[in-house]
């Protein structure tokens, strides 16, 4: 199921692969976010050419926007979307708990009010697993509570305990799955920013022995130093035999630091989101295409990129599209940023294989200032 090909000599970075029902996924792996079964503005063909073998979709949004019965009629999310690669489906818990005034938690699940039409719903840990089983998800994520930075210890302790209980009931559901379904369950560790809670959460989750482990509840507004502290602390408690997934990170500097600490999988919608403001990822840092200096610029965004934008169009033309709020500009910029992320991951893999990860990481981070990103 999971194999490591090469460990970095000096750090915890590693290269390997994960065998899933719809094909092999190489690690480290950046997972693009296709909330409703597709990336905004991008054809599946773009991702297929990039050899993207794992996309994230969101159970909460699919449940509210589409409905489980529709997916069931199509015999799964893969058939419905005509995506023949792997899906990881998040429970949507982060989204539910972000609406603090629209939800109520109990020991079995969460009552919430739809942000779309005001209808009332109830998610349980068992129900979330059943939905993702209907989806045919290749990786299932359980219901969990992603608590915000700055809450007190007692509240964090309560949410950690509830998350562990939900993980246990989800794990039991996974043992009674329908015949022929081979999706992997990755259980989520929580604990907010209290190390004793993190340690207890990880130990409790490890006792269940799920195929993979996710670190949740970081990169939620905390200072970068606190993020790195909890990331390193959590990593040291997770056995190397398990694939490790940090939820909700995806900017280049966060990815490089996560890989440094031995993280294998990450996701983020940031590469697509920043295109709304005309921000492009390049080897020389963030390019803000809306600046006046690019108005008459006939050159390409990046010479060594083979995306549609860089093969055909100028910086000046893209600036015109973005400033005019033309959808085509967002599509071109999104494709470029996704190309960039996959190219970056490929370079990182090569650096690890060549025992050059330290030099690569150091030189790369010099080009990217923290203020250029909004994680």
Swiss-Prot record:
Keywords: Glycosyltransferase, Metal-binding, Queuosine biosynthesis, Transferase, tRNA processing, Zinc. One of its GO terms (cellular component) is cytoplasm. Pathway: tRNA modification; tRNA-queuosine biosynthesis. Zn(2+) binds at residues 305, 307, 310, 336. Binds 1 zinc ion per subunit. The active site is at residues 90, 267. Pfam families: TGT. The keyword tRNA processing applies. It catalyses: 7-aminomethyl-7-carbaguanine + guanosine(34) in tRNA = 7-aminomethyl-7-carbaguanosine(34) in tRNA + guanine. Substrate binds at residues 90-94, 144, 190, 217. InterPro entries: ArchSynthase1/Queuine_TRR, TGT, TGT-like_sf, tRNA_ribo_trans-like. Its cofactor is Zn(2+). HAMAP family: Q_tRNA_Tgt. Belongs to the queuine tRNA-ribosyltransferase family. Catalyzes the base-exchange of a guanine (G) residue with the queuine precursor 7-aminomethyl-7-deazaguanine (PreQ1) at position 34 (anticodon wobble position) in tRNAs with GU(N) anticodons (tRNA-Asp, -Asn, -His and -Tyr). Catalysis occurs through a double-displacement mechanism. The nucleophile active site attacks the C1' of nucleotide 34 to detach the guanine base from the RNA, forming a covalent enzyme-RNA intermediate. The proton acceptor active site deprotonates the incoming PreQ1, allowing a nucleophilic attack on the C1' of the ribose to form the product. This is Queuine tRNA-ribosyltransferase. It comes from Borreliella burgdorferi (strain ATCC 35210 / DSM 4680 / CIP 102532 / B31) (Borrelia burgdorferi). The lineage of its organism: Bacteria, Pseudomonadati, Spirochaetota, Spirochaetia, Spirochaetales.
């Amino acid at each position: 199921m999971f194999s490591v090909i090469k460990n970095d000599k000096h750090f915890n970075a590693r290269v390997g692969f994960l065998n899933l029902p719809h094909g092999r996924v190489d690690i480290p792996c950046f997972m693009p976010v296709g909330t409703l079964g597709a990336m905004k503005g991008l054809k599946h063909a773009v991702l297929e050419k990039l050899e993207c073998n794992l996309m994230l979709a969101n159970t909460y949004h699919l449940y509210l926007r589409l409905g489980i019965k529709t997916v069931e009629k199509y015999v799964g999310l893969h058939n419905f979307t005509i995506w023949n690669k792997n899906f990881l489906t998040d429970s949507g818990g982060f989204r539910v708990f972000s609406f603090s005034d629209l939800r109520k938690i109990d020991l079995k699940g969460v009552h919430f009010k739809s942000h779309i039409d005001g209808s009332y719903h109830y998610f349980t840990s068992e129900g979330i697993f059943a939905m993702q089983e209907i989806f045919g998800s290749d990786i299932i994520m359980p219901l969990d509570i992603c608590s915000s930075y700055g809450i007190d210890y007692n509240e964090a302790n309560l949410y950690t305990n509830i998350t562990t209980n939900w993980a246990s009931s989800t794990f039991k559901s996974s043992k009674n799955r329908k015949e022929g379904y081979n999706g992997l369950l990755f259980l989520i560790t929580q604990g907010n920013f209290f190390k004793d809670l993190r340690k207890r959460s990880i130990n409790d989750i490890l006792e269940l022995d799920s195929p993979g482990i996710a670190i949740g509840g970081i990169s939620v507004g905390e200072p970068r130093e606190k993020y790195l502290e909890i990331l390193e602390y959590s990593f040291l408690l997770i056995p190397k035999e398990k694939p490790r997934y940090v939820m909700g990170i995806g900017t280049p500097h966060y990815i490089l630091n996560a890989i440094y600490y031995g993280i294998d999988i990450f996701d983020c919608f940031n590469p697509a989101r920043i295109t709304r403001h005309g921000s492009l990822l390049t080897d020389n840092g963030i390019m803000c295409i809306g600046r006046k200096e690019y108005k008459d610029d006939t050159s390409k965004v990046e010479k060594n990129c083979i995306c549609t934008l860089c093969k055909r169009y100028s910086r000046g033309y893209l600036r015109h599209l973005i400033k005019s709020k033309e959808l085509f500009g967002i599509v071109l910029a999104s494709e470029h940023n996704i190309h960039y992320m996959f190219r970056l991951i490929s370079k990182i893999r090569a650096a690890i294989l060549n025992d050059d990860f330290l030099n690569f990481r150091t030189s790369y981070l010099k080009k990217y200032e923290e203020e250029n990103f909004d994680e």
